Amino acid sequence: MKTLETRKEKKAQGKVLKAFGNLLQVTFEGNIRQGEVAMVHVDNLQLKSEVIEILGNQAKIQVFEDTKGVRLGSLVSFTGDLLEAELGPGLLSSIFDGLQNPLVDVADQAGLFLPKGIYLSALDRQRKWDFESSAKVGDVLFRGDRIGSTKEGRFHHFIMVPFSLYGKYRLTWVINSGSYTVDTVVAKAIDESGQEHSFTMVQKWPVKNALIHGEKIKPTKMMDTGERIIDTQFPLMKGGTFCTPGPFGAGKTVLQHHLSKYAAVDIVLFVACGERAGEVVEVLREFPHLIDPHTDEALMKRTVIICNTSSMPVAARESSIYMGITIAEYYRQMGLDVLVLADSTSRWAQALREMSGRLEEIPGEEAFPAYLSSRIAEFYERSGVVSLRHGKPGSITIGGAVSPAGGNFEEPVTQATLSVVGAFLGLSRARSDSRRYPAIDPLLSWSKYVDTVGNELSHQVDGWDQMVKRARHILFNGNEIGKRMEVVGEEGISMEDMLTYLKAELYDFSYLQQNAFDKEDAYCPLKRQIALFQLINQIFDTTFDFHTHDQAREFFLDLQNRIKNMNFISFDTEQYRKVFAEIKSIIEQQSRK
């Protein structure tokens, strides 16, 4: 029988031979394996590290902490375990670092400045959970099958047979329903060889291995984000992937925060990987006070935050990315829709570059390792929809922010990401400088899900996909005419071209741009988007007759301001309906002149 359980043999020991930053070369006795966790003894502390290269009786390990104090001959003890995530009830509403230490508990124990060498349990060992058993004695179970469940917020958190166990297990004992801690044995079973196994509410899984049990199926459902430019022009799907590259200050982090607040998913994993501490603090301050628009509950109840700021050790950036996706995979196996937001994958790639340089590997483009593309693809491939034996499928949607230096989309990290994602939401400096937020460039960005989502929305609105294509076409034409106007002026273009340009500007200003700090405009539900988009298309369809360019400009400026102001009014209220009717009346009056 195949198992991933900890090996019982004597654990290896070693000593430090060389130190190069957080890369240590050690000599060891015993058996170790790639990815194994090792503890480096420094004074009275033990620093967590990971084996990244083995050659004979020597190994190279990367330490997840500052290596100040490590000296020649320092003792290294190998644990026999891979770097693992602790999975069980209590993960939601938590704030972890890249090694899954609960930062609130660390702060209570060590104060405001995080010392090195402190590792705490990810789950609260004292808290009791109301466990309700669903399996019976005599049932034959496989990995991932449900033993029972407990209530975690508004979700049923299913207690499953550990994914590290393979083969058949026959239940011999199940605990009565009641309140228990996560370490309480809730069931016992025997495997095919007659060996007994005890199951608690906690299980562990190596973060570098994909946790998946079930068949991957094609994404079919749209992920509603409440962001008009995304849902209409560049839609996302549950189980899909997308990236948001852009220069510094273009609004990547604000966009990621918006998605974590308003995306129509069950659970959000926010991985702040190498972000500035100020931005992480903003998330930690803001999120506990925000309300989920879909459930009217606190947003933190569906959120897990993993913080690894730019001031923390570089090696932990990699572990934070993998830790986040592993927790997401665990919740996917319960049939939940999960959104993973990594901000920013560029900082993770920089950590790979730094370690690759210390390992003296042959560099690729811009000194990034040659295997950069495969690592990025590996991460995004852990997304997807999985068909489960118990009810509805679960999904993971991955969105990665990319921070190319100077907004250069030709650099290796952006190019490696673009080759594997399903949607590209490119933020441009030109749009952010002209205060056109969100600064997603409608001329650069693309989505592979446009046709699938278009077919889905065409059931609600006839010809939705054609309307979207025409709006994009008008945007392109308006942009070309705008460039011509810069050279020849307004007088040098025809009235027809002038109207196309003004329609494109109205669509951009009134529909694609959105105020993230306004209560009403921050989140635009799909029903409201459809009503507004139909109004915009009515303007596209209307034939206007103006005598001068100035007259046309004056009319369209007034019209776009009216539509913009309507976006700040609560949807479907008496005031909204009144303003909506006034706008339609103005359009009809002008078309009859």
From Swiss-Prot:
SUPFAM superfamilies: C-terminal domain of alpha and beta subunits of F1 ATP synthase, P-loop containing nucleoside triphosphate hydrolases. One of its GO terms (biological process) is proton motive force-driven plasma membrane ATP synthesis. It catalyses: ATP + H2O + 4 H(+)(in) = ADP + phosphate + 5 H(+)(out). The keyword Transit peptide does not apply. It is an enzyme of class 7 (translocase). InterPro entries: ATP-synt_VA_C, ATP-synth_a_Xtn, ATPase_a/bsu_AS, ATPase_F1/V1/A1_a/bsu_N, ATPase_F1/V1/A1_a/bsu_nucl-bd, ATPase_F1/V1_b/a_C, P-loop_NTPase, V-ATPase_asu. Keywords: ATP synthesis, ATP-binding, Hydrogen ion transport, Ion transport, Nucleotide-binding, Translocase, Transport. The keyword Nucleotide-binding applies. It comes from the Bacteria. Its EC number is 7.1.2.2. Belongs to the ATPase alpha/beta chains family. Produces ATP from ADP in the presence of a proton gradient across the membrane. The V-type alpha chain is a catalytic subunit. This is V-type ATP synthase alpha chain. It comes from Protochlamydia amoebophila (strain UWE25). The lineage of its organism: Bacteria, Pseudomonadati, Chlamydiota, Chlamydiia, Parachlamydiales. The gene is atpA.
